[in-house]
Amino acid sequence: MIQVESRLEVADNSGAKKVQCIKVIGGSKRRYARVGDVIIVAVKAALPRGKVKKGEVARAVVVRTKKEISRPDGSLIRFDKNAAVLINKAGEPVGTRIFGPVTRELRARNYMKIISLAPEVL
């Protein structure tokens, strides 16, 4: 579960390395974001020649969380770190590569581009 002030790794090659959640999209009182949810983030660390710079505000979709995700078949899936992929207003990823596995839950949210770029879908 991601909330305001949560720090996440960036799982793409947009140039950002670490981001911090500053807003969870979806209602004025929404507190937590799970896998597949869109959040507003501030870039806290970035590469020198990346597409995004430190201090920029961007949108991101959560792709991995430490909090387990329960599946309809009863199985659970969790990751070691929280991670997100930066997206633009249209929902397309800013980067051209995705690092690390992503979950099947993104398919239900219509993030097909992220799923096709990911090396592994769990």
From Swiss-Prot:
Pfam families membership: Ribosomal_L14 (PF00238)
One cellular component (GO) term of this entry: cytosolic large ribosomal subunit
CDD domains named among the record's database cross-references: Ribosomal_uL14 (cd00337)
Keyword RNA-binding: yes
A biological-process GO annotation: translation
Disulfide cysteine pairs (residue numbers): none
GO molecular function: large ribosomal subunit rRNA binding; structural constituent of ribosome
Domain of life: Bacteria
Record key words, sorted: Ribonucleoprotein, Ribosomal protein, RNA-binding, rRNA-binding
Sequence similarity: Belongs to the universal ribosomal protein uL14 family.
Biological function: Binds to 23S rRNA. Forms part of two intersubunit bridges in the 70S ribosome.
Description of how the protein assembles with itself and partners: Part of the 50S ribosomal subunit. Forms a cluster with proteins L3 and L19. In the 70S ribosome, L14 and L19 interact and together make contacts with the 16S rRNA in bridges B5 and B8.
This protein's name: Large ribosomal subunit protein uL14
The gene coding this protein: rplN
